[in-house]
């Protein structure tokens, strides 16, 4: 992303850089390396609306038993704090058959867990097929021999359909795990963030998920100190987190991202206030997570063994 956004600046500030490749051109890496070895300084960027051929052979950067599987790239949500649409381009889904083919190849090489990723997985297929199609993709992926678990990251609340929830609840292969960044819980802040849901709509979706998948782990991300956030609005967020009881939460103080609308919003919040609010929110969440973790004591869970160091095994559970 750094290369895509600041390619010209990088060559000036870091003259020791040999080559620059943007987000839409990583399939050209062999060509770029050959040019770099010749002493040239190739810069291949500006094609962030292009979808590289994902069927190219790949080397896993993860342990051999797990693999990330990209199902789409780019984002059309245009949240006011976020630069991703500028860097990654418009939302573009891969074809179902291409994704399944890659999953089959990964399984043949010993992969047991697939982690589906995109900037917005829940919107998968809307551009290709005219409707949200993540449920249809999952129906195909569960048939891939050798795959034990399928985990999905980065849902947007408004695109989590009843059909998707039903599909996730139906198959044991699909982990009961929802990674759903909500970003805030106050409706006015959500509106100024250009988010597409209200607090009430998010609560309704979360309740539906827990109704269909009682053991589902829900993780979220939240921004504290968005421009103009008042103490009352933060308290609204605090009570929202207290009510919903996320299993896991990552919270961050707002930072001004260059060229985004929110960077120029008035009433930027002081850093000390942001940090104090973050501490309060994370203290609340730590207590919630501890209670929810204690509720698992005495239960037997199926895990994927990740390692052994003569003292203990390390592992990852489906939730």
Where are these regions (language model features)?
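Hydrophobic, well-ordered secondary-structure elements that form the walls
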Residues: 180, 221, 241, 249, ...
């Amino acid at each position: 992303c750094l290369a895509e956004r600041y390619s010209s600046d990088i060559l000036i500030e870091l003259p020791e850089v040999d080559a620059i490749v943007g987000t839409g051109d990583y399939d050209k890496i062999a060509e770029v390396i050959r040019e770099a070895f010749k002493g040239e300084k190739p810069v291949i960027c500006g094609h962030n609306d292009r979808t590289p051929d994902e069927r190219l052979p790949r080397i896993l950067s993860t342990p051999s038993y797990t693999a990330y599987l990209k199902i789409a790239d780019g984002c059309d949500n245009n949240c006011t704090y976020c630069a991703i649409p500028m860097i990654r381009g418009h939302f573009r889904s891969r074809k179902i058959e291409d994704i399944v083919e890659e999953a089959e190849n990964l399984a043949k090489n010993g992969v047991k867990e697939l982690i589906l990723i995109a900037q917005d997985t829940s919107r998968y297929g809307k551009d290709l097929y005219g409707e949200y199609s993540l449920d249809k993709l999952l129906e195909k992926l569960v048939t891939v021999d050798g795959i034990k678990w399928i985990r999905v990251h980065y849902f947007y609340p408004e695109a989590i359909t009843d059909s998707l929830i039903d599909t996730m609840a139906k198959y044991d292969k699909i982990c009961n795990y929802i990674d759903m960044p909500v970003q805030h819980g106050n409706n006015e802040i959500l509106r100024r963030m250009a988010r597409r849901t209200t607090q009430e709509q998010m609560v309704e979706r979360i309740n539906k998920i827990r109704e269909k998948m009682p053991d589902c782990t829900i993780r979220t991300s939240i921004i504290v100190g968005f421009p103009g956030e008042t103490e009352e609005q933060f308290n609204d967020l605090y009570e929202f987190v207290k009510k919903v009881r996320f299993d896991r939460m990552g919270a961050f103080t707002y930072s001004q991202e260059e060229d985004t609308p929110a960077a120029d919003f008035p009433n930027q919040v002081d850093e000390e206030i942001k940090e104090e609010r973050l501490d309060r929110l994370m203290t609340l969440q730590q207590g919630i997570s501890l209670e929810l973790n204690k509720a698992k004591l005495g239960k037997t869970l199926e895990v994927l063994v990740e390692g052994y160091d003569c003292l203990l095994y390390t592992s990852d559970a489906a939730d």
